[in-house]
């Protein structure tokens, strides 16, 4: 069967002009005009998608089949072009019958032209073929326009769905034109409104926690530059962390009286459920007279010293991908879970804006992986946000998975980020030594995002940077009060 592309070539119909007209009409539609005004960053991303639209439309016209009736009429026209005038006169009755049988738009006009002339001359033969060709061109153009109109409606529907999705997620995930472009590319998947609303929900939560958002931005910029020393140095304040014995959850050392709700003895907690003893419980809480476990271990304390300023200039450093390990143990549930997921969303925003990769691994009793910056990034982000934090803590497996990933060539300059409360068993010696080797030999950097003030120093000392975001009730109230 004849293809539409072949028919266009035979009749010299310009399909490129029809495609350009359709694309211009699509870009000038009121829906896109309003969207471009509201989201100017996405305008460039959609405009960059125009070549793909053009190629898809061209492919559609190339593969389209011409109706059998029109195919038969075109074949008859081609055969008629090869006839001499005497041969054409002989074949004319059959040609007219064929046109009538095919319900050709040219059939009635052809019969009128023949009836209006008593004899068929060479000039009339040429005129007949010219007008017949014009009729075929009109039919081919109409067929092209019908197919393009169908494609336009389908394309407009697809663009509107992607605009709705991108418009909802642009304030959350697009920090610049690069991020907007990658967001538009990822919006091509089949997503329903209820799916991506989960990202909107965590985006709103992140906006309510500006300190958490700022922490993610600082981590993203932490590889921004390196310093170059100079001779004339001034003094500056320098803060460092020192270890000292303190009350941290490493070892139970006895009982004490305090107001530490997390370490409360069960009998004390039972009095809270007795109406007659409730006020007595609150009194002892205020006076720090509740019986709690006394814990013994090491803690980190901030020490402030003065030292010379040695920074003179900054040299831009390459920023690699993120490998983020998220603790999904039961202790990370609730508010910790919300913060961990929102923090990953903030890292995804940074990765899209800076054209970096963002790879998420959830560690508990098994490792679950998500690529948030790939073509299916939005679907992967939704699956990640739907995960529940109810497992145990296997920090060693997390580090082994990170180290295995870092050995791959495409991740040689990656930064590893571990999000946890770090209330877990000590790391095996082989894991610790391997991490130190990666830090020393390959300059890999390990970041800890600590969601608790009670993380074990023995675990956290292997990290290059510790970003603290205490999710305890006291810290949450203080942050709210400061805002």
UniProtKB/Swiss-Prot annotation:
Pfam families according to UniProt: VWA_CoxE (PF05762)
Cellular localisation: Cytoplasm
Listed InterPro entries: Uncharacterised_CoxE, Uncharacterised_ViaA, VWF_A, vWFA_dom_sf
GO cellular component: cytosol
Keyword Secreted assigned: no
Keywords noted in UniProt: Chaperone, Cytoplasm
Family from the record: Belongs to the ViaA family.
Subunit note: Homodimer. Interacts with RavA.
Role according to the record: Component of the RavA-ViaA chaperone complex, which may act on the membrane to optimize the function of some of the respiratory chains. ViaA stimulates the ATPase activity of RavA.
Protein name as it appears in the record: Regulatory protein ViaA
Organism of origin: Shigella dysenteriae serotype 1 (strain Sd197)
Lineage: Bacteria, Pseudomonadati, Pseudomonadota, Gammaproteobacteria, Enterobacterales
């Amino acid at each position: 069967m004849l293809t539409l592309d072949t028919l266009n070539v035979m009749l010299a119909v310009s399909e490129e002009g029809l495609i350009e007209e359709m694309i211009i009409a699509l870009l000038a539609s009121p829906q896109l005009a309003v969207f471009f005004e509201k989201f100017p960053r996405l305008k460039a991303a959609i405009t960059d998608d125009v070549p793909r639209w053009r190629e898809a439309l061209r492919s559609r016209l190339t593969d389209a089949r011409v109706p059998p009736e029109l195919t038969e009429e075109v074949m008859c026209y081609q055969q008629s072009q090869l006839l001499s005038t005497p041969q054409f006169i002989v074949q004319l009755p059959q040609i007219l019958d064929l046109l009538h049988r095919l319900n050709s738009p040219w059939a009635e006009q052809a019969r009128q032209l023949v009836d209006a002339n008593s004899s068929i001359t060479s000039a009339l033969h040429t005129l007949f073929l010219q007008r017949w060709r014009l009729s075929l061109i009109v039919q081919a153009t109409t067929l092209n326009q019908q197919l393009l109109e169908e494609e336009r409606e389908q394309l407009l529907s697809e663009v509107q769905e992607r605009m709705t999705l991108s418009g909802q997620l642009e304030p959350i995930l697009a920090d610049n034109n690069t991020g907007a472009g990658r967001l538009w590319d990822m919006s091509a998947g089949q997503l329903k409104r209820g799916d991506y609303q989960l990202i909107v929900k965590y985006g709103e939560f992140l906006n309510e926690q500006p300190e958490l958002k700022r922490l993610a931005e600082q981590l993203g910029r932490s590889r921004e530059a390196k310093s170059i020393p100079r001779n004339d140095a001034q003094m500056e304040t320098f803060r460092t962390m020192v270890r000292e014995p303190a009350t941290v959850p490493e070892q139970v050392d006895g009982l004490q009286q305090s107001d530490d709700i997390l370490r409360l003895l069960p009998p004390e907690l039972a009095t809270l459920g007795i109406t007659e003893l409730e006020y007595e419980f609150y009194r002892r809480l205020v006076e720090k007279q509740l019986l709690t476990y006394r814990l013994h271990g090491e803690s980190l304390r901030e020490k402030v010293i003065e030292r010379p300023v040695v920074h003179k200039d900054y040299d831009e450093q390459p920023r690699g991908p993120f490998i983020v390990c998220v603790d999904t143990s039961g202790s990370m549930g609730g508010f910790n879970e919300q913060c961990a997921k929102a923090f990953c969303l903030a890292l995804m925003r940074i990765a899209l804006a800076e054209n970096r990769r963002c790879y998420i691994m959830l560690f508990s009793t098994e490792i679950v992986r998500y690529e948030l910056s790939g073509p299916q990034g939005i679907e992967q982000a939704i699956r990640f946000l739907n995960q529940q934090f109810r497992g145990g803590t296997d920090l060693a497996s997390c580090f082994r998975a990170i180290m295995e990933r870092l050995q791959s060539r495409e991740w040689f300059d990656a930064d590893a980020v571990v999000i946890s409360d770090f209330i877990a068993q000590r790391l095996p010696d082989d894991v610790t030594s391997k991490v130190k080797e990666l830090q020393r030999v390959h300059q890999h950097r390990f970041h800890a995002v600590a969601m608790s003030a009670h993380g074990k120093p023995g675990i956290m000392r292997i990290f290059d940077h510790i970003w603290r975001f205490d999710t305890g009730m006291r810290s949450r109230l203080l942050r709210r009060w400061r805002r």
